Amino acid sequence: MVMRVGLLGLGTVGSGTAKILLDPAHRHPLVGQIELARVGVRSLDKPRSVAIEGDRLTTDLESIVADPTIDVVVEVMGGLEPARSLILKAIAHGKHVVTANKAVIARYGDEIFTAANEAGIYVMLEAAVAGGIPVIQPLKQALGVNRIRAVTGIINGTTNYILTRMQREGGDFESILADAQRLGYAEADPSADVDGLDAADKIAILASLAFGGRIKLSEVYSEGIRHVTTADIAYADRLGFVIKLLAIARRDGEFDETSDQSLDQLQLRVHPTLVPVSHPLASVNDVYNAILIEGDPIGQVMFFGPGAGEGPTASAVVSDLLNLAANLRAGTTPKATNPLLACSHQHYCKVSPMADIVSRFYVRLLAEDEPGVIGKLGLCFGRHQVSLESIVQIGQHETRAEIVIVSHEVTESNFQTALDELREYREIHSVASVLRVL
């Protein structure tokens, strides 16, 4: 039984997907049973890296999603519209969907999966998170017997590349960002990457799968790396840390063994973090991604690999097609989707406000270089139940001392209240940097 595919988009990922489907030799035999039937593009005249016969190409994307001979629609166009509308129309016409579009899934997943579940349709999204790293299906299947406690990841290659080079070379953010743009690792408008928005989309998807509930993207805290300086990276190194942009989804509290649903709250946050050099994620460098999953009884397992690019992302797209082809050959009936492939949860996860999050903190500040300042800092933190691991004068700028503080675990609200008080002190010139510590 041949499965006919309509491909929407023939850019980097679309071209990579087409190359695999048109060259099935020495791959799984089922790849040869997947036919690239039609390809939708914006322009027929654009030069492309893959040769597609003219009768397969069309600029009429809606005709593909409505074509009764198409079994699966692959959406790799990117952007929110018309991608969202075309996915919904494909579902309405009874087509299964494979997408690499994390922005659409993170924002419109409710609408899309509700429609898919009602229609008995699969929406597959292995390529939407971390490119070539196979993590979506393991979360649904191999790790499904575990009670997941946390998902922590480096899931944006652009920011990891920038921070890695800042660490190695001591270069500043702006100059390395410009290099990343020239090399194609960063977009002309890098905001989604460097401001943490891309990672927020991805951790929302991973959290939904890991914790079995829907996620409101607006409840994911996101903070980027623009304010990370070479001074912070150097001081972190002296303290035994590296700075990484981490995406964190963590379950607060214990499991309720009387219920099949966990009603406790989740932490959902993206921010630059001081990571101990001994931690598995500390050695993930350049454009590589990694996702560390903690669960019971498995303990810790980490997925590592390329997070983007034509080959890795296309591999993930075709892996979803392979799963669909195998499932359709097995003959599941309409309205009875395989629960290990479908996303059928309906309830929303409860998300803890940032004020309630417990974390360690790193602070760098400039203060007047005079007796009693460090003691005054310690007293202020103590009044707000902030216990300090270390407080040291690490440098000097003219008449001002540069002081670095690392706290023990404390609630975000208590720590920020202490900082607000410090900023009012005559002796404190500025709070130059505040970062969380893993």
List PLM regions with ranges.
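Rossmann-fold NAD(P)-binding glycine/threonine-rich loop
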Residues: 83-93, 102-140
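A short hydrophobic/small-residue beta-strand
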Residues: 96-98, 388
